[in-house]
């Protein structure tokens, strides 16, 4: 009986996972932009915008965790964390923007032999410094195409890699520790790196890098819409998945086991509390993925070396694509003469 139930759940999950994008193929908005596992990680306001296929899959997942938690709560917790760390399926090959055809392809290898693929651009008039771009969850390096040329014009060598389990890179899961190792390997194998730009999960990971990399006054960080408090992200995920307390406890234990830290450790405000180098923090007041409310206390008491650029109405994913925001980021990164 139990085996039959699990078999049906597994089959249903596979059907929805692979068929849902095609169910939605006649609805351009849904098939192109809304079929994203990111919706499973955000808050209830965002859920109001998701499509029919996502709601089917979400209900399947809720039923799955509820059933498994009754028999093996530790397993349910591990499976929930695995889901949290798994980007949505790569069912569509993306066309490379023109600027990427002029890049040199680079590959770095992680400790588990996972290959991380990226791109390198060299300026005509080098200033002998490098900028590394770290994209967010369920994103990829292509989305920062408009950053490349302005950085090259300022003389920077530019690196942009697809994170683990994203874009052209290998891997099945990503979380801060995995992403942090990837960035450290990029610095070792493709460095040196002098300045950093990161969005969302990439920005949170860069806050951890900033905490550990040293306090060089010449090194600049740009953090765009960082996941300020992982506890908020997890709480939204628990609520959305209808996880019970036993499963939540198992989930948090699995996080601690795999990362060697409690979830509270993974917070941009904690990591940057004593950081002394120049840093630009960009955030939108209407961000529904990484809430602006999470940064208010830190912003009020932040050290003077951290500058804030606060926008209104751009949300989480448009904030780094807007011309005015990009101009201010480039002004911040302009080399001193």
Enumerate the language-model features and the residues they cover:
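Alpha/beta-hydrolase active-site loop
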Residues: 173-194
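Catalytic histidine-centered segment of alpha/beta-hydrolase-like enzymes
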Residues: 314-323
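An N-terminal hydrophobic leader/cap segment in hydrolases
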Residues: 35, 43-44, 51-108
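Hydrolase active-site cap/lid region
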Residues: 213-261
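Conserved alpha/beta-hydrolase "acid-adjacent" motif
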Residues: 288-294
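The serine-hydrolase catalytic nucleophile loop
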Residues: 137-148
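Conserved alpha/beta-hydrolase
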Residues: 148-170
């Amino acid at each position: 009986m139990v085996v039959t139930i699990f078999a049906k759940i597994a089959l249903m999950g596979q059907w929805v996972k692979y068929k849902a994008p095609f169910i939605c193929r006649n609805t351009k908005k849904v098939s192109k932009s809304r079929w994203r596992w990111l919706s499973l990680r955000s808050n209830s306001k965002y859920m109001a915008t998701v499509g029919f296929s996502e709601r089917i899959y979400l209900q399947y997942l809720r039923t799955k965790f509820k059933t498994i938690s009754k028999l093996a709560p530790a397993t349910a917790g591990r499976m929930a964390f695995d889901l949290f760390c798994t980007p949505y399926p790569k069912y569509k090959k993306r066309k490379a923007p023109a600027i990427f055809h002029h890049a040199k392809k680079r590959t770095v290898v992680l400790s588990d032999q996972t290959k991380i693929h990226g791109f390198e651009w060299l300026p005509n008039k080098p200033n002998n410094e490098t900028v590394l771009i770290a994209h967010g969850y369920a994103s990829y390096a292509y989305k920062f195409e408009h950053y490349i040329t302005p950085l090259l014009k300022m003389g920077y060598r530019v690196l942009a890699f697809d994170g683990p389990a994203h874009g052209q890179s290998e891997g099945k899961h990503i979380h801060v520790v995995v992403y942090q190792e990837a960035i450290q390997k990029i610095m070792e194998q493709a460095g040196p790196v002098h300045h950093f730009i990161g969005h969302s999960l990439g920005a949170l990971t860069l806050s951890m890098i900033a905490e550990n990399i040293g306090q060089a006054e010449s090194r600049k960080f740009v953090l765009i819409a960082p996941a300020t408090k992982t506890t908020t992200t997890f709480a939204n995920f628990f609520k959305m998945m209808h996880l019970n307390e036993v499963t939540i406890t198992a989930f948090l234990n699995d996080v601690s086991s795999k990362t060697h830290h409690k979830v509270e450790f993974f917070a941009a405000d904690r990591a940057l509390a004593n950081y002394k180098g120049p840093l630009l923090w960009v955030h939108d007041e209407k961000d529904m993925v990484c809430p602006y409310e999470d940064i208010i206390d830190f912003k009020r008491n932040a050290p003077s070396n951290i500058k804030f650029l606060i926008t209104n109405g751009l949300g989480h994913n448009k904030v780094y694509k807007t011309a005015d925001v990009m101009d201010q980021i480039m002004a911040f990164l302009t080399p001193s003469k």
